[in-house]
Structures are given as structure tokens and as C-alpha cells.
Amino acid sequence: HESYLNALLDYIIADFRRFRKEQADDSIGAMIVCKTNPQAREMYRLWQERFGFAQHIEKEWNGQLSMVAAPMAAYGHAKPLRASLILHDEGDKLERKAYIEEYKKQQTVDVLIVNQMLLTGFDAPRLKKLYLGRSLDGHDLLQALTRVNRPYKDFKYGYVVDFVDIKE
């Protein structure tokens, strides 16, 4: 539901900005794990609405949303956060790889929005905040948690915000 996603996005944006400020490090990245691919697409659409379309890199796949948006900052406002949508059924393997590399190496993307992609085998040490909007258990949960626990600068561990009440 759009009102739920808007409230969730409000929280995530405020929390992530506060986290970066507290850590005094704008290179820190985050990942939002959505419940479904349609929810991830909607979250990404709402993200784009928040930060505008003044300047963006747009790739169209059968009329789907663009994968990376880079809006320009307005005078007197915080620098816009950039998001990338990475889904297994969006684009082809080479395109997804290019967006992942942009996140890892160029650090021009602040937040990755995913459903199932990148929860295992994804090594980006700057990823320090994980927002779980989908229930995970067992091996999948362990793999997701290890995404934020890579050594990076002075960080020894990452942080998880649990929106689905994972107990243990």
C-alpha cells in the first residue's frame, strides 16, 4: 500500500541520514530488502518522486522504471540520496553487474533497493545499514546479516533495522 511505503520511506531516509551524520561518513551505504519485486519497484518509484528527476541516468526495460536516479540538490537542502533498484527480473546480467559495480566502486549510489538479489555473495564493505522489510530465516537471514558485517574503515560491524519482527 502506498501510504505504508511512504511512511516506511520517510523513516528510512531520516534514519539513514542521521546514521551517516552520527558516523561522520557519507560513504556508508544501505540496502532496503523489500517483500516482493512489485513492492521494490514501488519503493523505488516513490524514492524517485522524493528526490526528483532533474538529472538522471535512465535505462528502460519494457516500460519499467529506470534503474538509477541521480537528482540534483536544491539550494539549502540536504544532498539528495541516490538509489538503485536491483531485481533478478530487471535488465540483463551485464546491466545488473554495472549497477552493482557503481555501488561498490564508484560510490555514487547510496542505497540499494532489492527483493532477493544481493542477499548472498554480495561483498560491498561500505554497506553498513540493512533495512529488512521481508522475513528471512535460517541461512538466508545469516547471509543477509553478513552483508553489513564486512570490515570497513573503523567499522567492525553493521546495523540492521527490522521492520518484520524477526525474533532470533
PLM regions and their residue ranges:
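Conserved RecA-like P-loop NTPase helicase motor core
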Residues: 75-168
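Conserved C-terminal RecA-like helicase domain
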Residues: 1-114
